[in-house]
Amino acid sequence: MQLNELKPVAGSRFKRLRKGRGLSSGHGFTSGRGTKGQKAHGKTRLGFEGGQMPLYRQKPKRGFTSMDHKDFALVSLTTLNQFEDGAEVTPEVLVANGVIKNVKSGVKVLATGKLEKKLTVKANKFSASAVKAIEAAGGTTEVI
């Protein structure tokens, strides 16, 4: 057997259907849509249910988007372990080291994982358990 003799398994490769390309193709003229009617002439819009009241209009509106919502960049204690012992960690340092993409509305430190380094952490928000964990490791926290 040579490389040039290799053939795909029978039935594994299909030729793409080219609809609307002449009567002799077998898929010309109406392109497999039947004759006349809404479905033959064009596409129905997204969510259209044939004239029946669509589900998205049957259900009542709920809730709203708060204009006061702040999107904090989240940082875990495990992530803070990459800094040297005694280092000062600020939002600018986190961005510079590629830990977070941007500061957004600020940085919130969460107590995910374990902190093994003594750090001075400056952030906009801390979870209560994160403050305990940082201070237990000998570090300090500062809300900016």
From Swiss-Prot:
Keywords: Ribonucleoprotein, Ribosomal protein, RNA-binding, rRNA-binding. InterPro entries: Ribosomal_uL15, Ribosomal_uL15/eL18, Ribosomal_uL15/eL18_sf, Ribosomal_uL15_bac-type, Ribosomal_uL15_CS. Pfam families: Ribosomal_L27A. One of its GO terms (cellular component) is cytosolic large ribosomal subunit. PROSITE patterns: RIBOSOMAL_L15 (PS00475). Residues 1-55 are annotated as: Disordered. The keyword Disulfide bond does not apply. Residues 23-35 have a biased composition (Gly residues). GO terms for molecular function: rRNA binding; structural constituent of ribosome. GO terms for biological process: translation. NCBIfam families: rplO_bact. Belongs to the universal ribosomal protein uL15 family. HAMAP family: Ribosomal_uL15 (MF_01341). Binds to the 23S rRNA. Part of the 50S ribosomal subunit. This is Large ribosomal subunit protein uL15. The gene is rplO.
